[in-house]
């Protein structure tokens, strides 16, 4: 698949275009231009390194939304075996913007749950652009309860702009479904490992992200609102999204510094979409390390650790009036 370049990557796109032209010429010519191709390839690689070393929060947001970025089911195919998808919330419907099911990770049975976007127009519409309705969160709760019953560790993958704000979703109890998931995940008697793989949008993300370990891919985001939404509220214009992204502190490095996540997983040069298999290999190691951390830990110790982790969120300082 031909790589889609973002606006800020146009210098790289131009170089890659020249490289492709030279490769096409070389295939139909007796002239050896391999050295020139190699020179331009090294130049493109260095340019990518330089560009990605100084990304703004808004540019990171664009990478997190890249249309070729691996989604949950892509990682399921690379990281897990014997995946058997489970459907429905047993109350209303099956929301396919959240996928989940039984699988094996390194031979160990587990439960996998994650947001799922679409690749083309038809699939994006079917999966509601990765924005779950209440039945999606209730399906996730059902699968988490099932995992707890059989003592299976839970892996969740976050990639959503946010919970769907439509009238039907609100009528069916969107906020209740999200709130219940927060409560349930805080009390579950089994390990939960969460990875933000793309967008982590507000409560829609948090509803499957109350975990014992929360990791983020290097160029993913996690925030209470999208930059465009924040800009529309504060500045009455979505054009201020770059400034909003800066103010939100939505990047992995900023959130790690604040103690809101536990680990950052580096991405291949140019982002996960440039090397999905390489990204999957890095993610596999991180998930295995996290799972080993909780193996052998008692249920009481696990829940106590989770509670302490949640209670450590946020810092404040008390002052005496007039001091």
Swiss-Prot record:
Top-level taxon: Bacteria
Main location: cytoplasm
Any one of the GO CC terms: acetyl-CoA carboxylase complex
PROSITE patterns: COA_CT_CTER
GO molecular function: acetyl-CoA carboxylase activity; ATP binding; carboxyl- or carbamoyltransferase activity
Keywords: ATP-binding, Cytoplasm, Fatty acid biosynthesis, Fatty acid metabolism, Lipid biosynthesis, Lipid metabolism, Nucleotide-binding, Transferase
Annotated EC: 2.1.3.15
GO biological process: fatty acid biosynthetic process; malonyl-CoA biosynthetic process
Pathway(s) annotated for this protein in UniProt: Lipid metabolism; malonyl-CoA biosynthesis; malonyl-CoA from acetyl-CoA: step 1/1
Catalytic activity: N(6)-carboxybiotinyl-L-lysyl-[protein] + acetyl-CoA = N(6)-biotinyl-L-lysyl-[protein] + malonyl-CoA
Domain CoA carboxyltransferase C-terminal: 39-293
EC supergroup of this enzyme: transferase
Localization of this protein: Cytoplasm
Matching InterPro entries: Acetyl_CoA_COase_a_su (IPR001095), ClpP/crotonase-like_dom_sf (IPR029045), COA_CT_C (IPR011763)
PANTHER family in alphabetical order: ACETYL-COENZYME A CARBOXYLASE CARBOXYL TRANSFERASE SUBUNIT ALPHA, ACETYL-COENZYME A CARBOXYLASE CARBOXYL TRANSFERASE SUBUNIT ALPHA, CHLOROPLASTIC
Family, per entry: Belongs to the AccA family.
Cited function: Component of the acetyl coenzyme A carboxylase (ACC) complex. First, biotin carboxylase catalyzes the carboxylation of biotin on its carrier protein (BCCP) and then the CO(2) group is transferred by the carboxyltransferase to acetyl-CoA to form malonyl-CoA.
Subunit record text: Acetyl-CoA carboxylase is a heterohexamer composed of biotin carboxyl carrier protein (AccB), biotin carboxylase (AccC) and two subunits each of ACCase subunit alpha (AccA) and ACCase subunit beta (AccD).
Protein name: Acetyl-coenzyme A carboxylase carboxyl transferase subunit alpha
Upper taxonomic lineage: Bacteria, Pseudomonadati, Pseudomonadota, Betaproteobacteria, Burkholderiales
């Amino acid at each position: 698949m031909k790589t889609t370049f973002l606006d800020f990557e146009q210098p790289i796109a131009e170089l890659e275009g020249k490289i492709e032209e030279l490769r096409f010429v070389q295939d139909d010519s007796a002239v050896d231009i391999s050295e020139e191709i190699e020179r331009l390839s090294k130049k493109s690689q260095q340019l990518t390194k330089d560009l990605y070393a100084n990304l703004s929060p808004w540019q990171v947001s664009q990478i997190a939304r890249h249309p070729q970025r691996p989604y949950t089911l892509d990682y399921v195919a690379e990281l897990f075996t014997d995946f058997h998808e489970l459907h429905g919330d047993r109350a209303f419907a099956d929301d396919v913007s959240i996928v989940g099911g039984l699988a094996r990770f390194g031979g160990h049975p587990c439960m996998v749950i994650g947001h799922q976007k679409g690749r083309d127009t038809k699939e994006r519409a079917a999966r509601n652009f990765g924005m779950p309705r209440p039945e999606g969160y209730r399906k996730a709760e059902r699968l988490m309860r099932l995992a707890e019953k059989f003592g299976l560790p839970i892996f969740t993958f976050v990639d959503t702009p946010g919970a769907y704000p439509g009238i039907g979703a609100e009528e069916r109890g969107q906020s209740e479904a999200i709130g219940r998931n927060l409560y349930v995940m805080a009390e579950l008697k089994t390990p939960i490992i969460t990875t933000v793989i793309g967008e982590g949008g507000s409560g829609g993300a948090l509803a499957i992200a109350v975990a014992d370990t929360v990791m983020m891919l290097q160029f993913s985001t996690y925030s209470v609102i999208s930059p465009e939404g924040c800009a529309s509220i504060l500045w009455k214009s979505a054009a201020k999204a770059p400034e909003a992204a800066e103010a939100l502190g939505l990047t992995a490095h900023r959130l790690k510094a604040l103690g809101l996540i536990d680990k950052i997983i580096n991405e291949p040069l140019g982002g996960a979409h440039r090397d999905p298999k390489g990204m999957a290999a890095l993610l596999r190691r991180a998930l295995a390390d996290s799972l080993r951390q909780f193996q052998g830990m008692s249920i009481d110790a696990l829940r106590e650790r989770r509670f302490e982790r949640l209670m450590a969120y946020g810092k404040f300082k008390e002052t005496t009036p007039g001091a």
